Curated annotation (Swiss-Prot):
Keywords: Methyltransferase, Nucleus, Phosphoprotein, S-adenosyl-L-methionine, Transferase
Superkingdom field: Eukaryota
Gene3D superfamilies linked to this entry: Vaccinia Virus protein VP39
UniProt organism field: Mus musculus
Role played: Protein N-lysine methyltransferase.
Uppermost EC category: transferase
Entry-linked InterPro entries: Methyltransf_16, METTL22, SAM-dependent_MTases_sf
SUPFAM superfamilies referenced in this protein's UniProt entry, alphabetically: S-adenosyl-L-methionine-dependent methyltransferases
Enzyme nomenclature, EC number: 2.1.1.-
Protein name (record): Methyltransferase-like protein 22
Protein's UniProt keywords contain Nucleus: yes
Length: 393
C-alpha cells in the first residue's frame, strides 16, 4: 500500500497565495493556532450580489441592494487597478484622439509624468513602490469594520479561516485564486448545481464547497489531514447562514487520492458511513477541483481517482477543474516553463483518449467571461476546464 496523501514530503520553502499576498493594508485577524502550531487567520470575502442574483438564491428581501457598476469588477480584470486609474487612462486616450497637445521628450516619445517619490523613501535610486502595512489583529481585539459590514449584510460575506505562508504540503490551508474563479462559475451556472449532489476533491479551506451548497442539495467536501479537515469544518460552520438559505448540506469527509477505498472506520474522524457512500455513488452529478495541480504525482493520483469514481457513479456527471498556469525558470531546461500545467494538460488529453467501452470523456475549456462576483485578480493564466462523462455509445 502506498503512502497517504498527507504523508508525501515536499522539499521546498514556504509559499504564499496571491490572494493573501495582494491584500495591502488589510486587517488580518489571527484567531488561533492550529494543531501544527501554525497561525490561523480569518478573512472575509464579499459577494457582489445584484438584486436579481440575490432573489434567485432564495435569500430574504432584506438583502443587499443592486450593486453599482463602480463596485462590480469587470470579468477578466484584476483587483490591482482602481476605477480612478481606469478613468484616467480613458481620459488620456480621449486627449490623444482629439489631437490635443501631448508632452513628448527630445526623441519624440511620449513623456510619461512620474508620480512624485515619497520623501521617506530610503533608497531614491530604486523604483518607487507602494508602502504596504498589513495589520495583524490579536484574537481579543475587535475587528469593528469587518463586524459592522458582516452584520449589515451577512448573506454577502463568506468567512474563511486559513493560514498564511505554508510549506508546499500544506498549501490547502490557504485560499487560492482558482477557488475564487471556480466559486464565480458556480454562482454563474446555477442550473448545473441546483438541487444536485456535488463532490469536491482537494477542497482545502472549503470555499468552493460552501458556495456550491447555496444551491446544491448535498456537497461532499473532501481532502486529507485531520488538521485541514477540522479547519474546513469550522469554515462550513462559520457560513451555515449561507448554506441554510438554499437548504444545502456540506459534509466534510476524508478522501485520499492515493487509496482505492474510502475510509469507513467509525473511530477515524471524517470517515464515511455506508449510507453516505451509497448516496455519493447514487446521486453525484458534479465533481469539482480547484488549484490542486502543482505536483505531477498528485495530479496522476487525482486523475486515477476521478476515473475510479466516475466508473462507480450511477449517473452521467460533469467535472469542473480550475488551474493556474504558473511559469518558473528551471535549471533542467534553462528556460521558463510551466511543467505542472503541461502535465495537467497531458493528463486531460490522455483522459479524453481513454476508451474502455464503458464511458467516454469529453474535455473542453470554459471561457472565463462570466461575471465576477468575488474580488480577486482574474488573470489570464487562470483557466477552467470541463469534463463531461457519459456512457459510451
Amino acid at each position: 500500500m502506498g503512502p497517504a496523501m498527507d504523508e508525501v514530503t515536499f522539499k521546498s520553502d514556504t509559499v504564499l497565495s496571491d490572494v493573501h499576498l495582494y491584500t495591502p493594508n488589510q486587517r488580518h485577524l489571527m484567531v488561533r493556532l492550529n494543531g501544527m502550531g501554525q497561525p490561523v487567520f480569518l478573512s472575509q470575502f464579499k459577494l457582489l450580489w445584484s438584486r436579481d442574483s440575490w432573489t434567485d438564491s432564495g435569500a430574504e428581501d432584506s438583502g443587499p441592494t443592486d450593486v453599482s457598476t463602480e463596485e462590480m469588477p469587470p470579468a477578466g480584470s484584476g483587483s490591482g487597478h482602481s476605477h480612478e486609474d481606469l478613468s484616467l487612462q480613458a481620459g488620456d486616450d480621449n486627449t490623444i484622439q482629439e489631437g490635443l497637445s501631448v508632452p513628448l521628450d527630445e526623441d519624440g516619445d511620449l513623456d510619461v509624468v512620474r508620480r512624485p517619490r515619497a520623501a521617506s523613501d530610503p533608497n531614491p535610486a530604486e523604483p518607487a513602490r507602494d508602502k504596504v502595512h498589513p495589520t495583524i489583529l490579536a484574537q481579543e481585539e475587535d475587528d469593528l469594520v469587518g463586524d459592522q459590514e458582516y452584520e449589515s449584510c451577512p448573506h454577502s460575506i463568506i468567512k474563511i479561516e486559513h493560514t498564511m505562508a505554508t510549506p508546499l504540503e500544506d498549501v490547502g490551508k490557504q485560499v487560492w485564486r482558482g477557488a475564487l474563479l471556480l466559486a464565480d462559475y458556480i454562482l454563474f451556472r446555477r442550473d448545473l448545481f441546483q438541487g444536485c449532489t456535488v463532490l469536491e476533491l482537494g477542497a482545502g479551506t472549503g470555499l468552493a464547497s460552501i458556495v456550491a451548497a447555496t444551491m446544491a442539495h448535498t456537497v461532499y467536501c473532501t481532502d486529507v489531514g485531520t488538521d485541514l479537515l477540522a479547519m474546513c469544518q469550522r469554515n462550513v460552520a462559520l457560513n451555515s447562514h449561507l448554506t441554510a438559505t438554499g437548504g444545502g448540506v456540506v459534509k466534510v469527509k476524508e478522501l485520499d487520492w492515493l487509496k482505492d477505498n474510502l475510509c469507513t472506520d467509525p473511530k477515524a474522524p471524517f470517515s464515511w458511513s455506508e449510507e453516505e457512500i451509497a448516496d455519493l455513488y447514487d446521486h453525484t452529478t458534479v465533481l469539482l477541483a480547484a488549484e490542486v495541480f502543482y505536483d505531477d504525482d498528485l495530479t496522476n493520483a487525482l486523475f486515477n481517482t476521478l476515473s475510479r469514481l466516475v466508473h462507480r457513479l450511477k449517473n452521467a456527471c460533469t467535472a469542473i477543474f480550475s488551474v493556474e498556469k504558473r511559469f518558473n525558470f528551471t535549471l533542467r531546461h534553462l528556460d521558463v516553463t510551466c511543467e505542472a500545467y503541461d502535465h495537467f494538460r497531458a493528463s486531460l488529453d490522455s483522459l479524453e483518449k481513454l476508451a474502455d467501452g464503458r464511458l467516454r470523456f469529453m474535455v473542453e475549456p470554459v471561457e472565463a467571461s462570466f461575471p465576477q462576483l468575488l474580488v480577486y485578480e482574474r488573470i489570464r493564466q487562470l483557466e477552467l476546464w470541463k469534463i463531461v462523462v457519459e456512457p459510451a455509445a
